[in-house]
Amino acid sequence: MNPGQKQEHDQYPLHDTQFVPQQMDRNSPFADPYPEDQPPPSGYDHQPLLRDNAPSYPPDPFGQPGGYPPQSTMYPPQPMGPPSPNMRYGEAPRRQPRRYKTTRRVKLTHGNLILDCPVPTPYLQAVPIKDTKEFTHMRYTAATCDPADFASQGYTLRQPILQRNTELFIVLTMYNEDEILFARTMHGVMKNIAHLCSRVRSNVWEGPKAWEKVVVCIVSDGRKKIHPRTLSLLATLGVYQDGVAKNVVGDKPVTAHIYEYTTQLSVDPEMKFKGADKGMPPCQILFCLKENNQKKINSHRWFFQAFGPVINPNVCVLIDVGTRPGKTSIYHLWKAFDISSNIAGACGEIRAMSGTAGVALLNPLVAAQNFEYKMSNILDKPLESVFGYISVLPGAFSAYRFTALQNDENGHGPLEKYFLGESQHGADADIFTANMYLAEDRILCYELVAKKKANWVLHYVSSSYGETDVPDSVPEFISQRRRWLNGSFFAGCYALFHWRKVWASDHSFVRKLMFMFEDLYNTYNLIFSWFALGNFYLTFYILTSALGAESLDPKPFSANVASILHTILNYIYILLIIVQFILALGNRPQGSKWAYFGSMTFFAILMVYMMFATIWITVVGVQDAVANADGSFTAMLGESTFRNIIISIVSTYAMYFIASFLFFDPWHMFTSFIQYIFLSPSYTNILNIYAFCNTHDVSWGTKGDNTVSTDLGVVKSKKDGSGDTTVEVEVPTEQKDINEAYEEACVELTRQVEPEVSHRDAKTKQEDYYRSFRTRLVISWIISNLILVVLITNENILASFGTFEVRSTSYLGFVLWSVAGLSAIRFCGSGLYLIFRIFMG
C-alpha cells in the first residue's frame, strides 16, 4: 500500500465480538470501484430507491436513437432466416443479483447463533431516525429449540435488552398469503400504532413514544410456504435479509428463523410506501419464519410459549393476515382490559369486506355471509358478553390478557388445553377429540371462564372491528364451513359435558347461575341444530301442502294444481337431499363445483315457492282472524294459524330489524336479507350434510413437515483457544451486495404478477372419486331426523293426536315459536348489552 493512502476497514461487524480489521484489496474484481475518498465518475447514480416514495420508471427504457425514422414492429416477432438454437421468446429474464459472502468467525451467545446485520443504505437514506442500533441493524437469531424451551435455552429478544415494557403484543399469523393481503393487515396495524401515539393525555401511552410499548410479531408457517413477494415486502421494510439464515447450527436443526428490527416504513395494499411524513411512527417487528410447516396452532405456540414469557406483555392481540383492523380498533380492544381487571379475553366485530360501493354484495354468497356476520355481532355476541362467556373469540381478530392464559404451577390451565390441539390431530386421537380441536379457540374460551380459583370473563367490544374477505365461491365456502361446523359442534359438546368445572371457579353465585342458564340455552340450540335437517323439510312440506288444504280460502290456484305442485316439489327436495349425501361421501367441493352450484340454485327456487306459500297463508290468516274476531286482538290470538305462524314469523323478523336499528347498523337488512333467505336452505341442507359426512376429515388443509433442509447453509461450531464456542458463518458483508438485494426486493414489488392457474394433481383427483366414509354419527343423525319426519307426516302414526292438519300446524307452531323464543332471548341480551355499555363504557 502506498504511503498516505487511506486504509479501509469493514465498519459493520456482525456481532459485538471484536474482529481483526482486514485490509480491502482494491485490485480484487469484487471490490467497490469507487472508494469513499475518491469522487465517482460523472453519471454515477446516487439516487436512493425510496427517496421519492416509490420507484418510477420511464415507459420506454430504450428510447429511439436520433437520426433514424420510427421503425414499425410486428408482434409476435418473426425470425429472420432459419431459427437460431439460442433464440428465446417471451418475457426477458429477471436480473439475478450476485451474492458476495465472506466467511466470518462469530462467537455464539449461550451456544446460540445471533447476528446483527446492517440494513441497506437506500433504506437508511429514506428514513429519519438512524442513530441507534435498533434502526441501523437487523438482529437475526437461529432458534434450534422447541417453543416451550426458548427462554430456558438462553434466547432473548430486543425488548428486554432495551429494558422496554410491552403493553401490546400483536401477532400476525400467515401461511402463503400474498403481499396484498399482508400489506392490508400490516398497514392497518401501523395505523393503529399511529393512533396510540396520538393519545398524548393517556397515562399508559404518553404520546409519541407509545410505539415503544407495542411489538408486532409476524409468524409465518413454513419457510418454503411463504409467498416470495411477501418476503420482498418484508425486505423493503428492513425486517428481512436474504442469505443470512442457516439450516443447522452446531449439529442442531434450526426450527425457526427470527428477525428483529424497528422499521420506520409501512407499505399500503397499493404498494405505496408511507413513512414519518405520512404520520407513521416506528414499529418494533419480530418476524418468526418457521423452518417447517406445522399448522397455525404451532405458530401460536411460538407466540405464547416462546416470545410471550420473554417480552411479558399485558395484552396479546391475535390477527390473521388478510384481516384489516379498523384505525382505532386495537385501542378499543385494549381499553376493555384497562377498564375491567377481570376481563380475560375480548373480541371485536368481524365484518365481511363488501368492496368499493358494496359491489361485492352483488354476489349472493357474499351478501348472505354479510347478513350472517352482522346478525351474529348484533344478537349473539352481545348476549354472550352479558353472560360473561363468549363461546368463541374469533382467531381472526381477538385479544387476551397474558396473565389469564398462564397455567398453574402443575402445568394445567388454558394454554395447556389449547395446545393439546397440536398433538390431537390425526390417527393418535379419537374422532371426537380430533374434531373438537378443529375449533381449539372455543376450548380456550371455555377454559378461561372455568379456570380454577379465578373469575375471568370474556367481553365483546362493538366499537372495535376487523374486516376480512369471505369466500366468494361455492367450493371454498363449503370447505370453510365444514371445519367451522364440525369444530363448533364437538367443542360445544365438550363445554356442555364439562359444565361442572364452572363451579370450581371463584365466580359469584349469580354469575354461575348465569352460566348455567347459558348452558341450557346452548343445549337447546345444539338439539335444534341436530334436527335442523328434518325441521326444515317439515316446514317446507307443511307450508306447501297447506296451499291445497280445504280450510284455506281463497287458494292461489285449484286444490288439484296445488297438490300436483306439492308432490313434484317434494320429490325434487328429497332427490336433492339424496344427491347431497352422495356428493358429500365421495367428492370434494372443488371436484363437484357445478353439482353444488346447481343444488344451491334448486334449493333457492324451492325457497321462493316456500316464501310464496308463507305470505299467502299469512295474508289469508290475518283476514280470517280479523273477520272471525270482530277486530278483537285477544280473539285473534285464539286462532291457531294466526298465533302459531303469523305472530312467530313476524316477531322474529321484527326483532332483527329493531336490533339492527338500535345498533345504528341496519343496512344489511336492505342489502343482504333477501339473499340470506334464499340461501338458508343451502345452509341447512348442503353445509350440514357435507360437514357431518366428513367428520373423518380432521385436517386443516396442511400437513406437518419434519424434514431438515440444508439449502441455506450449515453452521459448524468449535472451541477456540480461550474455551469459547465460535462458528464460521458465510453472510453478505459488502454494503454493495446488501444494497443490491434491497433494490431487488423493491423492484420485485413493482413487477406485474401473472395470475396463476391452479391445477389438481392426479392423486387429488383420485381422492375426489374414492374418498368415502360412513360413521355411526351420520347414521344416527339420518335416522333421528327421518323418524321425526315420519311421525309428523304419516297419516296413521300418532292418529290419536289428531289429523295431519292439526298435528302439522301444532308442530310447525312449536318450531316457529322456538325460533321466535331463541330470537327473543338474543334480543333481550342485545338490549342489556347496550344499557351496560352506556354506564360501563
UniProtKB/Swiss-Prot annotation:
Protein's membrane topology: Multi-pass membrane protein
InterPro entries: Chitin_synth, Chitin_synth_fun, Chitin_synth_N, Nucleotide-diphossugar_trans
Biased composition (Pro residues): 76-85
Any GO MF annotation of the entry: chitin synthase activity
Signal peptide: none
Purpose: Polymerizes chitin, a structural polymer of the cell wall and septum, by transferring the sugar moiety of UDP-GlcNAc to the non-reducing end of the growing chitin polymer.
UniProt similarity note: Belongs to the chitin synthase family.
Principal EC category: transferase
Domain of life from the UniProt record: Eukaryota
EC number: 2.4.1.16
Keywords: Cell membrane, Cell wall biogenesis/degradation, Glycosyltransferase, Membrane, Transferase, Transmembrane, Transmembrane helix
Residue span of region Disordered: 1-98
GO BP of this protein: cell wall organization; chitin biosynthetic process
Biased composition (Basic and acidic residues): 1-13
Official protein name in the record: Chitin synthase 1
Primary location group: membrane
GO CC terms of this entry: cell septum; plasma membrane
Pfam families in the cross-refs: Chitin_synth_1, Chitin_synth_1N
